[in-house]
Amino acid sequence: DEDDSIRAMILMGNGSAFCAGADLNWMKRMASFSEKQNFNDAMGLGRMMYTLYHMRKPTIARVHGPAFAGGTGLVAACDIAVGTPDAVFALTESKLGLSPATVSPYVIRAMGERAAHRYFLTGERFDAAEAYRLGLLTELCQPEELDHEINAMLGHVIAGGKEALRQIKTLIRDVADRRIDEALVRDTSQRIASIRASREGREGVSAFLEKREPAWMRTVK
């Protein structure tokens, strides 16, 4: 996240699945863990999910095949998720006598509380079309078009200013679900005032008026 030469991150699985869920060897070890050991183990996943969700750079999930349990959480924690019709999702923890606690903040934000009630409680699998309908997937395309769609999305993303993208991600997290009142009006007005007066903001507006590319686009040629 600190490397300025990296403009965005694409999260993808290696093989026929995006993420097939928990490793069986880990599950065997976990079965004998104490509550403290389980807490420490869960915090590892929790911190990873938190880091992904709070990355300052845009994140895009490239989803094909199964994305089960934590895999569904990884998709939800990304800013954008592009998937193919063979993508399938499930939060099956209840069938193991467990709950999807660690991934719940991200999944609920991505697909909504009502849908979370259904899929957390039933553990049902749901397909890519349903994930797209719920908003867990932001784009759905055929497998042969997946890389093209990802690259097109990436092109749109990196056309934005680096600092603008960072501030937009923070803006969405801070503004979502907030009451629209005088405090919010002042907050958002200050945000736009600050970025308009910034070096990047001035460069972007100047480039638009002068009908040229902004300086930040030179680094992606």
Functional labels for PLM-detected ranges:
Residues 5, 13-51, 67, 179:
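Glycine- (often His-adjacent) and acidic-residue-rich active-site loop
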Residues 105-114:
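Hydrophobic, secondary-structure "cap" segments at the distal end of domains
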Residues 82-87, 137-186, 199, 215-221:
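C-terminal long alpha-helix characteristic of the crotonase
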Residues 1-7:
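A short, well-ordered alpha-helical element
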Residues 49-98, 125:
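Glycine-rich beta-to-alpha active-site loop
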Residues 20-22, 115-124:
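Short helix- or helix-capping micro-motifs
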Residues 3, 55-56, 211:
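Acidic-histidine catalytic/liganding microenvironments
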